Amino acid sequence: MQRGALSPVLMLSAAPEPPPRPPPALSPPGSGPGSGSRHGSARPGPTPEPSGSLGAALDSSLRAAVAFKAEGQRCYREKKFREAIGKYHRALLQLKAAQGARPSGLPAPAPGPTSSPGPARLSEEQRRLVESTEVECYDSLTACLLQSELVNYERVREYCLKVLEKQQGNFKATYRAGIAFYHLGDYARALRYLQEARSREPTDTNVLRYIQLTQLKMNRCSLQREDSGAGSQTRDVIG
Protein backbone atom coordinates (compact mmCIF):
# COMPACT_ATOMS: atom_id res chain seq x y z
CA MET A 1 0.00 0.00 0.00
CA GLN A 2 1.45 3.39 -0.91
CA ARG A 3 2.05 5.71 2.01
CA GLY A 4 0.00 8.93 1.99
CA ALA A 5 -2.64 7.55 -0.39
CA LEU A 6 -6.25 7.82 0.68
CA SER A 7 -7.13 4.16 0.83
CA PRO A 8 -9.15 2.13 3.35
CA VAL A 9 -7.65 -0.32 5.74
CA LEU A 10 -10.30 -2.92 4.95
CA MET A 11 -11.10 -3.89 1.36
CA LEU A 12 -14.05 -5.77 -0.06
CA SER A 13 -13.85 -9.54 -0.09
CA ALA A 14 -12.76 -11.29 -3.25
CA ALA A 15 -15.49 -11.48 -5.86
CA PRO A 16 -16.71 -14.92 -6.79
CA GLU A 17 -15.92 -14.14 -10.39
CA PRO A 18 -12.97 -11.93 -11.54
CA PRO A 19 -13.53 -8.98 -13.89
CA PRO A 20 -11.99 -9.14 -17.38
CA ARG A 21 -9.29 -6.62 -16.35
CA PRO A 22 -6.28 -7.24 -14.03
CA PRO A 23 -6.98 -6.90 -10.28
CA PRO A 24 -6.30 -3.48 -8.73
CA ALA A 25 -2.81 -2.84 -7.41
CA LEU A 26 -4.04 -2.31 -3.85
CA SER A 27 -5.79 -5.70 -3.55
CA PRO A 28 -4.95 -7.48 -0.29
CA PRO A 29 -2.70 -10.51 -0.50
CA GLY A 30 -4.49 -13.72 -1.27
CA SER A 31 -7.47 -12.14 -3.11
CA GLY A 32 -8.41 -13.90 -6.29
CA PRO A 33 -11.23 -15.56 -8.13
CA GLY A 34 -13.78 -17.48 -6.10
CA SER A 35 -15.32 -20.83 -6.81
CA GLY A 36 -17.12 -21.42 -10.09
CA SER A 37 -16.12 -21.57 -13.73
CA ARG A 38 -15.21 -18.37 -15.60
CA HIS A 39 -17.52 -19.38 -18.47
CA GLY A 40 -20.23 -21.02 -16.35
CA SER A 41 -23.84 -19.97 -16.24
CA ALA A 42 -24.56 -16.57 -14.75
CA ARG A 43 -25.41 -16.48 -11.07
CA PRO A 44 -28.65 -14.76 -10.09
CA GLY A 45 -28.34 -11.29 -8.61
CA PRO A 46 -25.76 -8.52 -9.14
CA THR A 47 -22.06 -9.28 -9.18
CA PRO A 48 -20.17 -7.73 -6.24
CA GLU A 49 -17.83 -4.83 -6.93
CA PRO A 50 -14.17 -5.80 -7.29
CA SER A 51 -11.79 -5.28 -4.41
CA GLY A 52 -10.70 -1.64 -4.20
CA SER A 53 -13.99 -0.07 -5.32
CA LEU A 54 -14.83 0.96 -1.77
CA GLY A 55 -11.44 2.61 -1.44
CA ALA A 56 -11.99 4.52 -4.67
CA ALA A 57 -15.39 5.72 -3.44
CA LEU A 58 -13.87 6.80 -0.12
CA ASP A 59 -11.07 8.66 -1.87
CA SER A 60 -13.56 10.35 -4.19
CA SER A 61 -15.80 11.44 -1.30
CA LEU A 62 -12.90 12.99 0.61
CA ARG A 63 -11.65 14.88 -2.45
CA ALA A 64 -15.18 16.13 -3.17
CA ALA A 65 -15.61 17.30 0.43
CA VAL A 66 -12.39 19.31 0.34
CA ALA A 67 -13.36 20.80 -3.04
CA PHE A 68 -16.83 21.85 -1.84
CA LYS A 69 -15.30 23.40 1.27
CA ALA A 70 -12.93 25.44 -0.89
CA GLU A 71 -15.85 26.60 -3.05
CA GLY A 72 -17.70 27.62 0.11
CA GLN A 73 -14.74 29.69 1.25
CA ARG A 74 -14.62 31.41 -2.13
CA CYS A 75 -18.35 32.21 -1.97
CA TYR A 76 -17.93 33.59 1.55
CA ARG A 77 -15.12 35.90 0.46
CA GLU A 78 -17.40 37.13 -2.33
CA LYS A 79 -20.17 37.68 0.26
CA LYS A 80 -22.38 35.08 -1.44
CA PHE A 81 -23.43 33.66 1.90
CA ARG A 82 -26.38 31.55 0.75
CA GLU A 83 -24.24 29.88 -1.91
CA ALA A 84 -21.49 29.33 0.63
CA ILE A 85 -23.96 27.63 3.00
CA GLY A 86 -24.98 25.26 0.21
CA LYS A 87 -21.35 24.39 -0.57
CA TYR A 88 -20.53 23.67 3.07
CA HIS A 89 -23.58 21.43 3.41
CA ARG A 90 -22.53 19.48 0.32
CA ALA A 91 -19.05 19.08 1.78
CA LEU A 92 -20.56 17.66 4.98
CA LEU A 93 -22.66 15.21 2.97
CA GLN A 94 -19.52 13.95 1.26
CA LEU A 95 -17.84 13.52 4.64
CA LYS A 96 -20.77 11.45 5.87
CA ALA A 97 -20.43 9.26 2.80
CA ALA A 98 -16.72 8.83 3.51
CA GLN A 99 -17.38 7.80 7.11
CA GLY A 100 -19.54 4.79 6.44
CA ALA A 101 -21.79 4.92 3.42
CA ARG A 102 -21.35 2.21 0.81
CA PRO A 103 -20.69 3.29 -2.77
CA SER A 104 -23.81 4.23 -4.68
CA GLY A 105 -25.37 1.19 -6.33
CA LEU A 106 -23.34 -1.35 -4.36
CA PRO A 107 -25.71 -3.92 -2.80
CA ALA A 108 -25.30 -5.09 0.77
CA PRO A 109 -23.35 -8.37 0.84
CA ALA A 110 -25.14 -11.59 1.74
CA PRO A 111 -24.26 -12.86 5.24
CA GLY A 112 -21.49 -15.38 5.28
CA PRO A 113 -17.75 -15.80 5.79
CA THR A 114 -16.93 -14.07 2.50
CA SER A 115 -19.08 -10.99 3.02
CA SER A 116 -17.46 -7.62 3.65
CA PRO A 117 -16.97 -6.79 7.35
CA GLY A 118 -18.56 -3.39 6.74
CA PRO A 119 -17.71 0.02 5.35
CA ALA A 120 -14.07 0.89 4.85
CA ARG A 121 -12.30 2.08 7.96
CA LEU A 122 -10.53 5.40 7.80
CA SER A 123 -6.79 5.49 8.17
CA GLU A 124 -5.38 7.89 10.76
CA GLU A 125 -4.52 10.40 8.03
CA GLN A 126 -8.01 10.16 6.56
CA ARG A 127 -9.61 10.51 9.99
CA ARG A 128 -7.66 13.71 10.65
CA LEU A 129 -8.66 15.08 7.25
CA VAL A 130 -12.34 14.29 7.87
CA GLU A 131 -12.28 15.89 11.32
CA SER A 132 -10.48 19.08 10.27
CA THR A 133 -12.71 19.52 7.21
CA GLU A 134 -15.84 18.92 9.28
CA VAL A 135 -14.80 21.47 11.91
CA GLU A 136 -13.96 24.06 9.27
CA CYS A 137 -17.32 23.55 7.54
CA TYR A 138 -19.36 23.92 10.74
CA ASP A 139 -17.28 26.90 11.84
CA SER A 140 -17.77 28.58 8.46
CA LEU A 141 -21.49 27.76 8.45
CA THR A 142 -21.97 29.69 11.70
CA ALA A 143 -20.14 32.67 10.20
CA CYS A 144 -22.44 32.57 7.15
CA LEU A 145 -25.60 32.20 9.25
CA LEU A 146 -24.68 35.20 11.39
CA GLN A 147 -24.52 37.27 8.20
CA SER A 148 -28.10 36.38 7.31
CA GLU A 149 -30.88 38.96 7.48
CA LEU A 150 -32.89 36.64 9.72
CA VAL A 151 -30.40 34.65 11.79
CA ASN A 152 -31.33 31.10 12.76
CA TYR A 153 -29.75 31.13 16.21
CA GLU A 154 -30.82 27.57 16.96
CA ARG A 155 -28.77 26.39 14.00
CA VAL A 156 -25.86 28.62 15.04
CA ARG A 157 -25.95 27.05 18.50
CA GLU A 158 -26.08 23.54 17.04
CA TYR A 159 -23.10 24.08 14.73
CA CYS A 160 -21.02 25.81 17.41
CA LEU A 161 -21.54 22.91 19.80
CA LYS A 162 -20.50 20.47 17.06
CA VAL A 163 -17.25 22.40 16.65
CA LEU A 164 -16.65 22.46 20.40
CA GLU A 165 -17.13 18.70 20.60
CA LYS A 166 -14.01 18.38 18.45
CA GLN A 167 -12.12 21.52 19.49
CA GLN A 168 -12.95 22.67 23.01
CA GLY A 169 -10.51 25.55 22.73
CA ASN A 170 -12.03 27.05 19.57
CA PHE A 171 -12.47 30.74 20.43
CA LYS A 172 -14.85 31.65 17.59
CA ALA A 173 -17.17 28.72 18.29
CA THR A 174 -17.20 29.56 22.02
CA TYR A 175 -17.98 33.23 21.38
CA ARG A 176 -20.64 32.47 18.77
CA ALA A 177 -22.25 29.89 21.05
CA GLY A 178 -22.55 32.64 23.65
CA ILE A 179 -24.21 34.91 21.09
CA ALA A 180 -26.63 32.16 20.08
CA PHE A 181 -27.64 31.40 23.68
CA TYR A 182 -28.07 35.13 24.34
CA HIS A 183 -30.49 35.60 21.46
CA LEU A 184 -32.33 32.41 22.41
CA GLY A 185 -32.92 33.84 25.89
CA ASP A 186 -30.70 31.37 27.77
CA TYR A 187 -28.66 34.05 29.51
CA ALA A 188 -27.00 31.80 32.07
CA ARG A 189 -25.46 29.62 29.38
CA ALA A 190 -24.69 32.66 27.24
CA LEU A 191 -22.71 34.20 30.08
CA ARG A 192 -20.84 30.95 30.68
CA TYR A 193 -19.68 30.69 27.06
CA LEU A 194 -18.92 34.40 26.79
CA GLN A 195 -16.81 34.35 29.94
CA GLU A 196 -14.97 31.33 28.59
CA ALA A 197 -14.33 33.27 25.38
CA ARG A 198 -13.07 36.25 27.41
CA SER A 199 -10.62 33.99 29.26
CA ARG A 200 -9.04 33.23 25.87
CA GLU A 201 -9.27 36.74 24.40
CA PRO A 202 -9.46 39.16 27.36
CA THR A 203 -9.42 42.33 25.23
CA ASP A 204 -11.91 41.34 22.53
CA THR A 205 -14.42 44.22 22.51
CA ASN A 206 -17.24 42.17 20.99
CA VAL A 207 -16.99 39.58 23.75
CA LEU A 208 -16.92 42.27 26.44
CA ARG A 209 -19.94 44.02 24.93
CA TYR A 210 -21.99 40.82 24.85
CA ILE A 211 -21.03 40.02 28.43
CA GLN A 212 -22.38 43.43 29.49
CA LEU A 213 -25.59 42.91 27.50
CA THR A 214 -26.06 39.46 29.01
CA GLN A 215 -25.53 40.71 32.57
CA LEU A 216 -28.04 43.52 31.99
CA LYS A 217 -30.59 41.00 30.74
CA MET A 218 -30.01 38.74 33.74
CA ASN A 219 -30.39 41.66 36.18
CA ARG A 220 -33.58 42.77 34.46
CA CYS A 221 -35.03 39.26 34.59
CA SER A 222 -34.12 39.03 38.28
CA LEU A 223 -35.92 42.33 39.03
CA GLN A 224 -38.97 41.18 37.11
CA ARG A 225 -39.11 37.97 39.14
CA GLU A 226 -38.84 39.97 42.38
CA ASP A 227 -41.60 42.35 41.30
CA SER A 228 -43.77 39.43 40.26
CA GLY A 229 -43.24 37.74 43.62
CA ALA A 230 -44.00 40.94 45.55
CA GLY A 231 -47.19 41.48 43.55
CA SER A 232 -48.32 37.95 44.27
CA GLN A 233 -47.78 38.41 48.01
CA THR A 234 -49.74 41.70 47.96
CA ARG A 235 -52.70 40.03 46.26
CA ASP A 236 -52.63 37.25 48.86
CA VAL A 237 -52.75 39.80 51.70
CA ILE A 238 -55.62 41.75 50.10
CA GLY A 239 -57.52 38.57 49.36
UniProtKB/Swiss-Prot annotation:
Region described as Disordered: spans on this chain: 1-57, 99-126
Classification via InterPro entries: AIP/AIPL1/TTC9, TPR-like_helical_dom_sf, TPR_2, TPR_rpt
A family per Pfam: TPR_2
SUPFAM superfamilies xref list: TPR-like
TM regions (residue ranges): none
Keyword terms, alphabetized: Phosphoprotein, Repeat, TPR repeat
Coiled coil segments of this chain: none
TPR repeat ranges, renumbered to this chain: 65-99, 171-204
Modified sites of kind Phosphoserine: 7, 27
Gene3D superfamilies: Tetratricopeptide repeat domain
Record-stated family: Belongs to the TTC9 family.
PANTHER family (alphabetical): ARYL HYDROCARBON RECEPTOR INTERACTING PROTEIN RELATED, TETRATRICOPEPTIDE REPEAT PROTEIN 9B
Name of the protein in its database record: Tetratricopeptide repeat protein 9B
Top-level taxonomy: Eukaryota, Metazoa, Chordata, Craniata, Vertebrata
